[in-house]
Amino acid sequence: MAGNSWKSINWKDPFLLEQQLTDDQRLVRDTAHQFGQEKLLPGVREAFRKEETDLNIFKEMGSLGLLGSTIHGYDCPGVDYMSYGLIAREIERVDSGYRSMMSVQSSLVMYPIYAFGSEQQKERYLPALSTGELIGCFGLTEPDYGSDAGGLITRAKSVKGGYSISGAKMWISNSPIADVFIVWAKNDEGKIKGFILEKGMEGLSAPKIEGKLALRAS
């Protein structure tokens, strides 16, 4: 009896996910799958070997609605989280570096702006991030404490007209090519605050880490 039930399992879809999806979710999944197989897969080996990131990938993802896909409004498609998970799985199927590029842009850059930013900030950044015209990164992890937010050394000191931020971040995906930086720091009271920085601001640098062992295409 046990042998018969074992043989009846569909190993291509053991959790029967396919029959649980809606038509819209399948369409999103198939779109991401086609993009991954036709656009990303042919060049991933060379990108991995050379540690190169093709900036056009962001624009191609944006044109298909794959960036900031769960956000409603601001030129974003507003799909459900199941669809977002399916997108991530299809991009991850090709390379985790490409998935990292997409998920950092969507979940760690666009979502914080959408959830906590002012209306002016949302209108300024989200449409351009959704198309891939702008590239973003998420600056939490630091050399000394890793991703332990409670141990942040980076400080945001109140000054006339705003804040002066000092500190260092490490292992920040997308940072060497980013236009928008979501940076987390402790303020004068020791509370963690998020800041939006832009490429070219005085004192801001994002050198590329050479010789990575993984995520080399991102």
Where do the model's predicted regions map?
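A structural signal for short hydrophobic beta-strand segments in well-ordered beta-sheet cores
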Residues: T154-K157
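Flexible, small-/acidic-enriched active-site or ligand-binding loops
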Residues: G151, G200-S218
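Buried hydrophobic positions in well-ordered alpha/beta secondary-structure cores of metabolic enzymes
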Residues: Q25, G36, I87, S118, ...
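A short, Trp-centered hydrophobic/proline-enriched beta-strand micro-motif
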Residues: G132-L140
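Hydrophobic, small-residue-rich alpha-helical packing segments that form membrane-like cores
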Residues: S147-D148, Y163
